[in-house]
Amino acid sequence: MLWDLKLKVGHSSRTIADCLRLGREDITIRTALLEHRFLAGAADLAYTLATRLTSELFRKTGAEFIEAKLAERAARHQRQGGQRYVLEPNVKEGKGGLRDLQTLYWIAKYIHGVKSPADLVDRGLFTREEFDTFSAAEDFLWAVRCHLHLIAGRASDVLSFDMQVEVARRMGFE
């Protein structure tokens, strides 16, 4: 159904052994496994996967994960020009964009086992104000990105000059 709606859906079908093996070999796959979710089927199998990922893949590899994610971030920033303040930002991949927020959350989830960014407050990792700022930034960037996609009629992550006025208008800015 999701494909019929022309939605891009990340998915894979693997055994638990394959998940563990591939997760050890590839940090991108490991990150995807960190974000896995049960949709339908054998709930006991999903529980076994989650338990084994935590005990056999995530536990005791936090430093390795952080190092890899920070290296990915540095490479991504370099590809985007390395600038924080740009006139036509990439809202997904640029400095301060959605991927930076996701990276921060993925690291917290990996290290502390949180289920949502709100859990960071309960764990004392974010103050309520920091969480509110994080959430507002994430909501804003997602809204900008969704408007870019709707206006362009395709995936588009660069807030170019020709898109800025229309995105601002749609978001209620004068």
What are these regions (language model features)?
Residues 1-174:
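A nucleotide- and high-energy phosphate-metabolite-utilizing enzyme signature
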